[in-house]
Amino acid sequence: MAVRKAMKYSLGPVLYYWSKETLEDFYQQAAASHADVIYLGEAVCSKRRATKVGDWLDMAKSLAGSGKQVVLSTLALVQASSELGELKRYVENGDFLLEASDLGVVNMCAERKLPFVAGHALNCYNAVTLRILLKQGMVRWCMPVELSRDWLVNLLNQCDELGIR
């Protein structure tokens, strides 16, 4: 009989613009929640700069201190050198797993042999792509929101055929 693993609950990153104080309050509440894994970071727009990289890292440390697994979410589209600099700080944080929402982040993690979560913004629609990401260090995949249940079932069958599930 196969051993079943306990299901883990994840809380995704806040996708709306909230003030730094509101985010801090939210994540303090999340620390006391039943969520096992908490994703945090600016994943939508770098122009929303009320919360800086250092602030996100401080919140991540606080959450980790309360027993949560923390994943730092990254931008879905890197457009400026300032955004690249911030991404480097995330990649080089030394403590937390990253959610790669851009292939540039995948590359940065792979170059450093760092594990990463493939975020829903990556265009990953088949098992061959998942196998490539696995070889680059992916430890978890978040399915793109536009995919259906039937697509997922088919993809899981492809993964079984490739021996990567």
Task: List where the protein language model places each region.
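Alpha-helix-loop-beta-strand connector modules within alpha/beta enzyme cores
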Residues: 53-73, 109-112, 155-165
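Short, acidic/polar
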Residues: 19-31, 82-87, 124-131
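A general structural detector for well-ordered alpha-helical segments in enzyme core domains, enriched
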Residues: 26, 55-59, 86-90, 105, ...
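Catalytic alpha/beta core domains of metabolic enzymes, predominantly
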Residues: 104-106, 115-165
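Catalytic domains of carbohydrate-active enzymes, especially glycoside hydrolases
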Residues: 24-44, 136
